[in-house]
Amino acid sequence: MTAQPNPIINQEFLFALLREAAPSGYERRAADVWKKEAATFARVSEDHYGNVYAELGPEDGPAVALLGHLDEIGLMVSHVGDEGFLSVLAIGGWDPQVLVGQRVRLLAPDGDILGVVGKKAIHVMEPEERKNASRIEDLWIDVGLSKEEAQARIPVGTYGVIEQGPLMVGDKIVSRALDNRVGAFVVLEALRLLQGAELKHRVVAVGTSQEEIGSYGAQVGSYRLQPVAGVAVDVTHETGQPGVSEKKYGVVPFGSGANLAVGPMTSPVILRQMITAAQASGIPYTLSANPRLTHTDADTMILSRSGVPSAVVSIPNRYMHSPNEMVDVRDVKACIDLLAAWGRALEVGTDFTR
């Protein structure tokens, strides 16, 4: 049975983003979908590093940046073995256990090729082997080709992603790459809500590249825009699932709304503004302590040029960096609404001094 479209969010656009393969360094496919949607209501541009931009408001106004990274964790072919089996390296932070038995889409030069992640079956393992966790170097991709065919069609350096599309499970969205295609979706949908508003700033939504390997796209984009303030939208760990500590991550269950980071890397001024906007509009939110880095695009935006006052808004996410991540539609909508409310209220000349 086909799931019905969700009326709370633009599900068609989000699912279109999620269907595209866009590992770090190969974001083009998702960027094209994002840019096409943005062009229906905003001024759009891009840079040589894979970032895409959409903006509203006065073109000569001070910039405010809303960042959501388009890239996902992936794989890269490093070797073609004698029997045509492919060795791969990780792009980003994989738990190799979740790769075993998965279907993979390889983004080969002459067209995508599907394969499966192979591992020695438990029946032929020695007893000691069964106790060991899988390592990525112990896995391979089987594409059903000979060595000669594989070498001809799949050169070293070919990118790959898990082959897993989006679906609705109740009011939850399940897909690979929700980290952080959903953040890129949120920043553009928030910008959409600002159409017709008398904006005092040039509000720029950015679909950034290469967050999963170091937030390099955010560094390039922030340097280009020179924003007076910025927000990174990403995912955080949902704490209603087994084994995720509320003592460490805060109380962040599904349905709790937008999660706001509190810590030395983020701007206390923007945090207060966000809380005020949320309370005024009845938008649910939670707080999480981040005493060091935020591990988002904010970490490089904050240090761009002479520094950018920044905040982090996160969507609670289960099963992060797996083929089937999960988010709640209500939390996605809360993040969209909060960014838009903050953007409308932001005054030119705000003093962001701590």
Question: Language model features by range: what are they?
Answer:
Residues M1-R354:
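N-terminal hydrophobic/helix-forming segments and targeting peptides
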